[in-house]
Amino acid sequence: MRLLNISVLGCGRWGTFIAWYANKIGHNVMLWGRENSRNYIELSETRKNDYLKLSEDLELSNSLHKAISFAEIIIISISAQELRSFANQLNLIDEIQGKTFILCMKGLEATSGKRLSQVFSEIVGKNTNIAVWIGPGHVQDFVNDIPNCMVIGSENIGITKKIVQEFNSDLIRFYYGQDLIGNEIGAATKNVMGIAAGMLDGLNYSSLKGSLMARGTRELSRLVTAMGGNDLTIYGLSHLGDYEATLFSLHSHNRKFGEAFVLGQKFDKLAEGVSTVKALKELSKQYDVELPISNALYEILFESKDAKDTLEELFLRPVKFEF
């Protein structure tokens, strides 16, 4: 590993952790946030949030131009639905040319169903390198030295290997992603299954999570195949490997959202899976792939169908072979 200048754009829970991690393993790090954001103000005043404390040698900045100019590698961790408008902002900065961008989000563009690397590439792809950083793990575990495995994916295997070499450690073991389509679809849709798992918890049907895991991976592997990816990727770290952290963990925002939704309770944290449910509705049409679980969630979230009635309808679907 060589010492790099790295900027992390986005100072939410995950972005702040990535900055903390990159600094911890020896890189020079700048963390960017919007000047008036609650997270940035808190970090500027205290250098800590609810999960971790930043080292004094990690620089904070609210200047996007400064953050881009500083770094060789730029990591983006913002809401997936804000990526297109944010990329348009970045595209106004001449210094983005030749940089390597790593997208550290798990989502799809709700209106188009496009993968985040597609969205970003459309706007700033020329003369830049684009990769994704995905897989299981919670900030609360990592900062307590509980290790996990993750994936780096890119259309350029040389870029993938370089990033893994610079970020691999005894806290996070990275694997080379070989299927960008499958990795991105898998990472985004595990949040959808997390919402479904939370709904099962709220309905006292938690024992159905095993069936959700089996059938959820099956329907999403069909989608990945239709999109030109490798169906086996769904059974790797980006999707199935992230189920423990998403379907069972008390830290999972998507699981907690699903549970709160069926119980009629308020939940004010970001649950990226909600927008991904919309994207899957679009992809199901585009690729003519049946996605019964994802479609059921769409009906519950956006058409006000009763969750328990919708689950019963899934059970009344025609009997078929498992594989």
Regions found by a protein language model. Give the residues of each.
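Internal alpha-helical scaffold of NAD(P)-dependent oxidoreductase catalytic cores
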Residues: 82, 89, 119, 123-129, ...
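NAD(P)-dependent Rossmann-like dehydrogenase/reductase catalytic/cofactor-binding core
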Residues: 197-198, 225-235, 240-323
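NAD(P)+-binding Rossmann beta1-loop-alpha1 motif at the extreme N-terminus of oxidoreductases
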Residues: 1-62, 70
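Rossmann-like NAD(P)(H) cofactor-binding subdomain of soluble oxidoreductases
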Residues: 54, 61-69, 73-145, 163
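Electropositive phosphate-/nucleotide-binding environments in soluble metabolic enzymes
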Residues: 12, 16, 61, 77-80, ...
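Alpha-helix C-terminal capping/helix-to-coil transition sites in glycosyltransferase folds
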Residues: 69-70, 189, 240
